[in-house]
Every structure is written in structure tokens, then in C-alpha cells.
Amino acid sequence: MKNLIRPMEIGDKKQSIDMMREFYLSPALITNGSEEIFNANVDNCIGNSQYVEGYVFCDGDTILGYAMIAKSFSTEFGKHCIWIEDLYIKEQYRKQGIGSSFFKFIEEKYEGCLFRLEVEKGNEKAINTYKKADFTELPYLEMKK
């Protein structure tokens, strides 16, 4: 299987939102999202947003999963920061190296940047995947308003 990582396009909107619904209902997240949020996410990914990018993972015409990144600057580390916001691979395509390929792709595209992501403490499969990609835990409690 030759996987392709490409930017999200308008024709991917329905499938991307379908995957977001599944992802946001999983134990990987503490929020369920909403149709308004899913549409805004995809619209910003396929638009010209300077803050967010969306990607789909494909094998030919078959979409295997998606990812979204957000861009910021880390004053703590003194460099641009790429937040891997969503990384979802359909169940039947997991453990085929798609996540690893995405990490390599994004690290090459944004060489020299800091990469961050969030993971639920009990999501051992994801934690192990991220550790294999050289992510390390930060001892912070995250807060929002």
C-alpha cells in the first residue's frame, strides 16, 4: 500500500467530518465537538487560514484518516510550535505506519519547529506511538477558558 499525505480539499469535507465525528466520540478526547466545530475546522483547513492546516491520508481514492495541525510560537522554547491537534486513522488502517509517516512528513515540512500534542492519560496505544516518534511527556496541567 502506497500512502499519500496531501492537504485537505473541498471534496474531502464530508469524509473528513465523518471521521471527526467518530474521533470526537472516542475515548481519545474529553469533548464531543459539534457540527459547527467540525465544519469550521474543515472550512479553515481548506481555506487560507494562517493558523491551521488539514491533511488526509490516502491510498488511491480511499481516505484512510486525517490530521489537523495548528501553528503558534512557544516563548518557553523560543521557536515556532506546531500543535498536532487531531490525528485520526480509521481502525482498519491502524498499525500500518501511517502515523509514523505523518510525523516524518510534518517534521520535514516544519524543520526546526517544536512539535506538541495532547493525549489522554489512559490512551496507552497512542502514548506508545508518540513515544516511538520521540515525543516526551511535559509535566503541565493544561487549562482553558
Give a label for each model feature.
Residues R116-I127, K144-K145:
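Conserved beta-strand-loop-alpha-helix junction that forms the acyl-donor binding cleft
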Residues N44-V56:
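A short helix-loop-beta-strand connector motif used in the catalytic cores of GNAT acetyltransferases and
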Residues I89, K95-E108, N128, K132:
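Conserved acetyl-CoA-binding loop-helix of GNAT-fold acetyltransferases
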Residues F103, Y110-E120:
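Conserved GNAT acetyl-CoA-binding A-motif
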Residues R21-D43:
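Conserved GNAT-fold acetyl-CoA-binding loop/helix
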Residues G54-V56, T62-K71:
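Conserved beta-strand in the GNAT
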Residues N3-D18:
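A short beta-loop-alpha structural element at the N-terminal edge
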Residues K79-E91:
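Conserved acetyl-CoA binding element of GNAT-fold acetyltransferases
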